[in-house]
């Protein structure tokens, strides 16, 4: 099988924990101070994560080599936009940049209700930015300077230890334009 064919297959299909699909992990519209219970775990979010955030996260994970244990995922925002929207026009680039910055600040707390323990993690530990950036100007960073992300260590462990996983056809997911339809598709892949 050619290298290009392998890359195409890897980019079209990703594995995600069932909890991310069969629960309201990503909502259609932003919902503040959200939490939900699944099994013996309560998931709390510090910010609203919508299906658009899910689309960015899923597409970022599609750049990860499944055989490389590194948490570093290298890509350009243009490549990410082309995967998500099939176009890297300025509107899509700006939308993707904003969603990336929001994902970097998103924190999730999982409370084990049986053992009365919890863990807090971020989905994206940090964004790789080419060159020096003033902290006050970070919100206005140019998309061309974003070179990839580092996935949070705890989030990677959750992805690797997920007892129940499901597959997501990224090409189908990205072809859906309606947020509601995307959220429904995300939900139903957990039951396939």
Tell what function each PLM region has:
Residues 1-192:
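Charged, alpha-helix-forming regions
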């Amino acid at each position: 099988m050619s290298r290009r064919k392998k890359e195409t297959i890897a980019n079209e299909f990703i594995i995600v924990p069932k909890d991310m699909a069969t629960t309201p992990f990503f909502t259609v519209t932003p919902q503040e101070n959200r939490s939900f219970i699944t099994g013996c775990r309560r998931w709390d979010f510090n910010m609203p994560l919508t299906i658009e955030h899910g689309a960015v996260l899923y597409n970022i994970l599609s750049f990860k080599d499944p055989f490389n244990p590194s948490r570093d995922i290298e890509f350009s925002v243009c490549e990410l936009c082309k995967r998500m929207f099939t176009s890297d026009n300025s509107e899509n680039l700006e939308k993707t940049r904003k969603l990336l910055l929001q994902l970097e600040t998103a924190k999730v707390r999982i409370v084990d209700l049986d053992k009365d323990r919890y863990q807090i993690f971020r989905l994206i530990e940090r964004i790789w930015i080419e060159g020096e950036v003033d902290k006050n100007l970070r919100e206005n960073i140019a998309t061309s300077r974003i070179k990839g992300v580092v996935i949070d260590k705890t989030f990677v462990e959750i992805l690797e230890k997920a007892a129940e996983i499901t597959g997501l056809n990224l090409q189908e997911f990205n072809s859906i334009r309606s947020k509601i339809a995307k959220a429904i598709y995300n939900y139903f892949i957990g039951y396939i």
